[in-house]
């Protein structure tokens, strides 16, 4: 079952689901009035009231990639990101360039888990290219997303490019919240994130 199928099925069972709107960018907030102003795909400003708002800023690759021939040039969701094959993570124009992590123009996987799983593939393929062989090892797009449900409970969802579940820990049910998934997030992942911020990883 694809992850998205499960999410849609559960969403449809909610009595009052939150409305989902696409193709709008946040352009302003009236904090006192609890109003968020969005620009829609027709360049019209749409204002919505809110009780709670969580904002994810627009994402892009680093400017040295965006402003170079290394970036995807064609319009679309990958424009500006590193122009790599989603399978080999080898650059589509410059065969001696490979990508890792959140600068890649791949359909999914801008997480630390993606970097961890894709690094051995990139190393293998890079060594092959150095020795005159083709990059032959393929990456499935693995990514992992620990979702906190509440204090002491989380879901660990692991999936590939197509949204298919590919759990790596058999003791954690990917579509059910559990204390074990929460413990993994707080006991292992959180210290790793903090160490990374301090430059220790």
Predicted regions and their residues:
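Rossmann-like dinucleotide-binding cores of NAD(P)H-dependent redox enzymes
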Residues: 1-24
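A conserved short coil-to-beta-strand element within the FAD-binding core of flavoproteins
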Residues: 22-35
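Short gly/ser/thr-rich secondary-structure transition/capping motifs
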Residues: 32-39, 77-83
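A structured beta-alpha segment of the ubiquitous adenosine-cofactor-binding alpha/beta core
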Residues: 39-46
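FAD-site-proximal beta/loop scaffold in flavoenzymes
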Residues: 46-117
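C-terminal auxiliary extensions adjacent to catalytic cores
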Residues: 47, 156-201
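FAD-binding beta-loop-beta segment adjacent to the flavin cofactor pocket
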Residues: 80-98, 149-169
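A conserved FAD-binding loop/helix module that cradles the flavin
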Residues: 100-149
